[in-house]
A protein has these predicted regions:
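Mobile cap/lid helix-loop segments that gate and shape the active-site cleft of serine hydrolases
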Residues: 245-293, 314-322
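Conserved strand-to-loop "acid loop" that flanks and positions the catalytic carboxylate
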Residues: 298-300, 304-313
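Short beta-strand immediately N-terminal to the catalytic nucleophile in serine-hydrolase-like folds
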Residues: 223-225, 249
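Gly/Ala-rich beta-loop-alpha elbow adjacent to hydrolase catalytic centers
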Residues: 225-229, 233
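Cap/lid segment of the alpha/beta-hydrolase catalytic domain
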Residues: 128-215, 219, 239, 259-264
Length: 322
């Protein structure tokens, strides 16, 4: 991955300015989810998308199909502010401050433990009264989790939380469940059907936190990520329309192009186990795919930088999607 990719991504960030598909229904294999012209691609007699209401029907069906696999996004109507504490504070050059924070994403009750996420938050001591755009920065599959985008290890060209902060943004780099400081037992937390939905929930609480900060313009929020962080950006941005710009560095391809259609890599507890248990790792049965998800981000901005020799996320599937 070359540094210029994130330079372009930064330029993009500066702009911050279907009925459910059942397994017994007929489908055209990999073509169904790539067809964005129809209100319902399985039943084209319903007609093509002619207006915004038609597209909303299609987007609603995409979300329903996504939640069949990931589990439903819990109700967020009575959450209240995010409680957090500062664990460490480190001054950096040019008036930048790196704070290691911890915040509650799930309150405990008689049936489950409270869950807390640690993250690195970059803010500015100079012109501290200015409300700045903010970016949620999601890490790749790496043991140190949030430490890589924060510039504390890993690949130098993936220190995007630090780099974007140096360019004037407020940035937040949280741990994905089971990475970094976020020890997490997926099987012991049965309220989540997938690690993907748990991560989406945590990320949305991160957006809540950012919007409440006096240093942040709550109407200018973006999200960026590499690999795991790339598709995590897409998933989170699909559910959270407060994210106005989504930037991915690899992280997706058509399911039929992922290891020639072998979806085992998507099925661990960290991701979507139902792809294996309910859909036999068969991309022709999984009721959603990335062309729909990325289309569902419209009219918000989306940028991707995808390598042409990626073994995981095969580039022709990216081209099919875009």
């Amino acid at each position: 991955m070359k540094r210029f990719a994130f330079t372009v991504a930064t330029a993009i960030l500066m702009s911050l300015a279907l009925p459910i598909l059942g397994q017994d229904q007929p489908r055209e294999l990999d073509q169904v989810h790539a067809n964005l012209d129809w209100v319902d691609p399985v039943s084209p007699e319903i007609g093509t998308i002619q207006n915004l209401d038609d597209w909303k029907r299609r987007r609603d069906s995409i979300r329903k199909n996504l939640e069949i696999v990931m589990g439903s996004l819990p109700d967020r109507s009575n959450l209240g502010p995010v409680a957090f504490e500062v664990l460490e504070e480190t001054p950096l050059p040019d008036g930048l401050i790196r704070r290691k924070i911890q915040y509650i994403t799930e309150k405990g009750d008689a049936h489950r433990k409270e869950d807390r996420v640690q993250a690195y938050l970059f803010v500015h001591s100079q012109n501290a009264n200015i409300r700045r755009p903010a970016v949620l920065c999601l890490h790749q599959t790496i043991g140190i989790g949030k430490g890589e985008p924060a510039g504390l290890g890993g690949s130098k060209n993936l220190h995007y939380a630090l780099e974007l902060a140096q360019r004037g943004y407020v940035t937040l780099a949280p741990d994905y469940p089971s990475f970094g400081d976020h020890e997490y037992d997926f099987r012991a937390n049965s309220q989540w059907a997938s690690g993907s939905m748990k991560a989406i929930w945590d990320n949305m609480r991160g957006i809540d936190l950012l919007q409440d900060l006096p240093q942040v313009d709550p109407k200018r929020i973006g999200c960026i990520g590499h690999s795991l962080g790339g598709h995590n950006t897409i998933f989170t941005s699909f559910f959270d329309e407060r994210i106005l710009v989504a930037v991915t560095s690899c992280g997706f391809t058509r399911f039929h192009k992922y290891y020639s259609g072998n979806l085992q890599g998507w099925t661990s507890d960290r991701y979507m186990p139902r792809i294996a248990t309910n859909y036999a790792n068969n991309p022709s049965l999984v009721p959603f795919d990335f062309p729909e998800l990325i289309a569902g981000l419209a009219p918000r901005a989306f940028f991707t930088s995808s390598p042409i020799r990626d073994d995981n996320f095969e580039v022709s599937g990216v081209r099919d999607t875009i």
